[in-house]
Curated annotation (Swiss-Prot):
This is Ribosomal RNA small subunit methyltransferase A. It is an enzyme of class 2 (transferase). Its EC number is 2.1.1.182. The keyword rRNA processing applies. Its main location: cytoplasm. GO terms for molecular function: 16S rRNA (adenine(1518)-N(6)/adenine(1519)-N(6))-dimethyltransferase activity; RNA binding. Belongs to the class I-like SAM-binding methyltransferase superfamily. rRNA adenine N(6)-methyltransferase family. RsmA subfamily. One of its GO terms (cellular component) is cytosol. Residues 1-34 are annotated as: Disordered. It comes from Gluconobacter oxydans (strain 621H).
Length: 303
């Protein structure tokens, strides 16, 4: 299979690239000659496993554009989740990042990643763990970023976990299914606006930076993908306030077609809404992030 994307993909990706004017990544001063990614995959007999939500991104040009979303990585630590055969990993190592930690649960990929680490003995570190059970912020010193093509089946819980400790991260550049990326960045009143949008936008500024079609992956997924760039705010909620927000948004959007006085009943909704000066007949999707923040503060204070 050719590593060049089809013409339809090139047009789509070029349009996204030009609209964002993402600069190319800076290369380190010492070039490393690596075997081709496809040859490496073939030599190790690695294929994407559906049960792990894997879709390998092999095009080096696209991987470079994703790595560039981190900005100038000089002196930064980068964590990548689910590197698989290492296509994006190679692009990250081709930036000035001081170190790259890759977290991989699939033991079939470990020998391949270990082999890549021999070319970058002081920069690439292979972490053989389940990212859902790992405090990724403990892997490397700050300032640190996460840049990753996330496994689809664990992408949302991973993001929520990182939002709980958003102060630990300078930036998150994460690939999701397009629908999930749009939910993260959705505005109030839209059908995509929900719990994920409120939690994400409460803690960070969020934008969809790149849209990538199925043809860019092996095997091609059934849906389009997108990279969301999430930049945490300077001030972050306390862990207690974050839990209060999770409770409010879970109740509000768990019954999103109901009026708030009904959907929030289990947490004393009538009283909270009155204190927040929010009409109890409104529905969850009409509230701004700031209004949800006020409800979370009142919810915490009432405990």
């Amino acid at each position: 299979m050719s590593s060049r994307p089809p013409a339809s993909f090139s047009a789509t990706f070029s349009a996204a690239r030009s609209s964002k004017c993402v600069p190319p990544p800076r290369r380190p001063s010492t070039d490393v000659s690596l075997p081709s990614l496809r040859d490496t995959i073939q030599a190790h007999g690695l294929d994407a496993k559906k049960s792990l939500g894997q879709h390998f991104l092999l095009d080096p040009g696209i991987c470079a554009r994703i790595a560039a979303l981190g900005g100038d990585l000089t002196g930064r630590s980068v964590v990548e989740i689910g590197p698989g055969p290492g296509g994006l990993t190679r692009a990250l190592l081709d930036t000035p990042a001081s170190r790259v930690d890759v977290v991989e649960i699939d033991e079939r990929a470990w020998p391949l990643l270990d082999e890549l680490a021999t070319y970058y003995p002081d920069r690439l570190h292979v972490v053989r763990q389940d990212a859902l059970k790992l405090d990724a912020a403990t892997l490397a010193p700050a300032p640190r970023q996460i840049i990753a093509n996330l496994p689809y089946n664990v992408a949302t819980p991973l993001l929520v976990g990182w939002l709980r400790q958003a102060s630990q991260w300078e930036r998150l550049s994460l690939m999701f299914q397009l629908e999930v990326a749009e939910r993260i960045c959705a505005a109030p009143g839209s059908s995509a606006y929900g719990r994920l949008a409120v939690l994400s936008q409460w803690c960070a500024s969020c934008s969809v930076a790149l849209r990538i079609p199925p043809a860019a992956f092996s095997p091609p997924p059934k849906v389009h993908s997108a990279v969301a760039v999430i930049i945490p705010h300077a001030e972050q909620p306390s862990p207690q306030l974050f839990r209060a927000m999770e409770q409010v948004t879970a109740a509000a959007f768990g019954q999103r077609r109901k009026m708030l006085r009904s959907s929030l009943k289990s947490i004393g909704g009538e009283r909270l809404l009155e204190q927040a000066e929010i009409e109890p007949t409104r529905r969850a999707e009409t509230l701004s992030v700031a209004e949800f923040a006020r409800l979370a503060e009142l919810n915490l204070a009432s405990r």
